[in-house]
Amino acid sequence: MSTPCIITVAITGSVPRKEHDPAVPISVAEQIESTQAAFEAGAALAHVHVRNDDQSPTSDPARFAELLHGLRRACPGMIVQFSTGGRSGKGPERGGMLHLGCDMASLSTGSCNFPTIIYENHPDLIRFLAKRMREFGVKPEIEVFDLS
């Protein structure tokens, strides 16, 4: 008996830079190419972050739009999940791209300690992001980092 599963690919993340690994796809074109390779290998869902030209994380809706349109062309039928993570912005701008038509988005349900930072997710922000997701028909990926 087989068990159905969804393979998710997170090709960039918000931390790695080219200096850490030259193969990390940073530009939109690199991300599309890398995601397409994963899609062709069987990945069904892409969890995506976008970057500025200096490789820093961003919540820039224009970058997300460019990536989304490219992924829709290169990977038809793939589920696209936007990151609303805190390393790419503070407050409401973390949800500024949810109107673009992604299928899913991450929804962190609390704050936690990462090795070098506090990943802050204020209850008001969580409610705001959840409301925006509902408003635009985006399915949340509920993230629970710390149960304490």
What is each model feature region?
Residues 1-23, 106-113:
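N-terminal small/glycine-rich loop or linker at the start of catalytic domains
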Residues 3, 9, 56-82, 127-135:
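Alpha-helix-loop-beta-strand connector modules within alpha/beta enzyme cores
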Residues 4-10, 45-47, 77-81, 102-106, ...:
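Structural preference for beta-strand elements that scaffold enzyme active sites
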Residues 10-14, 51-53, 83-87, 108-112, ...:
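Active-site beta-loop-alpha junctions enriched in small/polar residues
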Residues 19, 44-66, 114:
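Glycine-rich, proline-tolerant flexible connector loops at the mouths of alpha/beta enzymes
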Residues 31, 38, 49, 105:
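Conserved, mostly hydrophobic/aromatic
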Residues 88-100, 147-148:
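Catalytic cores of alpha/beta
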Residues 104-148:
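Catalytic alpha/beta core domains of metabolic enzymes, predominantly
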